[in-house]
Amino acid sequence: MHYPMFSHAPEPADQQHQHNGEERTAALCVESTLEPHEAWAALTEYIHLWWPRQLLQSEESHIDLSTELLLEETADGDIIPVARIIQCENEDVLTIAPYPGTRLGRLLGVVEESEESLSFILDALTPETAEGPLSLLEISSGTYTGREDEELGIYEEQEEAAALLMGAYSRFIGAELQKEEL
């Protein structure tokens, strides 16, 4: 917490705008004709059907989302925590913080003393035509706060993992991953 009346207190680092001196380099999103509740169910309830195999310990592993953790169950029955759930607001936002040593954590460059996170943000859209998109899922580095002026996007070093996750999700729902350079 930052208290500006204490002049000796250091200014807080703004994680939303920069990450290790880097700026957000890409915006990744998926527009879908699914209703928002269906897009949310695909993201959360059916995560085991789309989660990238490259991020699992083995082909036989099963991924599951609990209230506090993203878990992987191996073919041997071992349960491996993949990420901590930072926030999960139904049909709105899911933020995960991968653990170091997991495949996702290694791909994101997570180290013990840092807390890297990714937020999946769902927006309901008003379609311009009957066939128009009804929902939009974006992925953003860091923890989404919902501020109007909040900068969204992915840091360059997290782009590979974000594209892998969003690409798998988009294929599962029959949509296309969209990328915009920032």
Where is each model-derived feature located?
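Short, highly charged C-terminal tails/helix-capping segments
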Residues: 11-12, 60, 167-182
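Glycine-rich portal/gate segments that line the openings of hydrophobic small-molecule binding cavities
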Residues: 48, 54-110, 167, 176
